[in-house]
Amino acid sequence: MKDAGNRAKHGVSLTLAAELDWDAALVWVDDRFAYAEFRMIALAPTTGILYYVAFVDRASVRRIISLRRANRREVKHYVESI
């Protein structure tokens, strides 16, 4: 259900997160709101495309909340930060 919603909204399956290059990801804490859990944001590449992903790490499991292609501003931020 969550995956179907993400595909409808962003055109990307949450399962794509398994293919992201997490070692090359730019990761930071998502502190925009007072979430009930410790959320993270990442800009992570795969096959020449940069993705914006919101996630939570729970023990040894990474739960993907949202995944979409990064916009121009986010790509610029990633390039300037690496």
Identify the meaning behind each predicted range.
Residues 1-82:
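Ribonuclease/tRNase effector modules and their secretory precursors
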